[in-house]
Amino acid sequence: MRKRAAKKRPLLPDPRFNDQLVTRFVNNLMWDGKKSTAFKVFYDAMDIVEAKKQDQEKSSVDIWKDALTNVMPHVEVRSRRVGGATFQIPMQIRPDRKISMAMKWMILYSRRRNEKSMAQKLASEVLAAAKEEGAAVKKRMDTHKMAEANKAFSHFRF
């Protein structure tokens, strides 16, 4: 095991929106180290969001950030063994893990959509999540329901 927690490496902001969160999302989106392809997919998706959006005041990145906020879970259940039985214990999630989970869910459920390109799938999932719809938001709701159902075990904190 490590002696201390690994230091966080600084992320460079992306070239188009100058935002570190976008770079973090693209790093999750990337396959086989193909970062330029991942950036192209993300930027194409943002162009599609820009074309399809209803709210004219907000930029496509603001809509994406709203979608990410709507997908972020606040509590999760973790397994803990107590006297031979395994309990699902609800716990608060730290802020950086909330963001990571939201990004991963959004990408996962985008990939599962039935559309032509990944950019179209991602754009559709972003627009759906911004309206509090879509599979990624459903995943957050299910996670919260699971935590609510197991509230009785919350005294078994880690």
Curated annotation (Swiss-Prot):
It holds the Pfam family Ribosomal_S7. Keywords: Ribonucleoprotein, Ribosomal protein, RNA-binding, rRNA-binding, tRNA-binding. It comes from the Bacteria. GO terms for biological process: translation. One of its GO terms (cellular component) is small ribosomal subunit. GO terms for molecular function: rRNA binding; structural constituent of ribosome; tRNA binding. Disulfide bonds: none annotated. PANTHER family: RIBOSOMAL PROTEIN S7 (PTHR11205). One of the primary rRNA binding proteins, it binds directly to 16S rRNA where it nucleates assembly of the head domain of the 30S subunit. Is located at the subunit interface close to the decoding center, probably blocks exit of the E-site tRNA. HAMAP family: Ribosomal_uS7_B (MF_00480_B). Belongs to the universal ribosomal protein uS7 family. Part of the 30S ribosomal subunit. Contacts proteins S9 and S11. NCBIfam families: rpsG_bact. This is Small ribosomal subunit protein uS7. It comes from Flavobacterium psychrophilum (strain ATCC 49511 / DSM 21280 / CIP 103535 / JIP02/86).
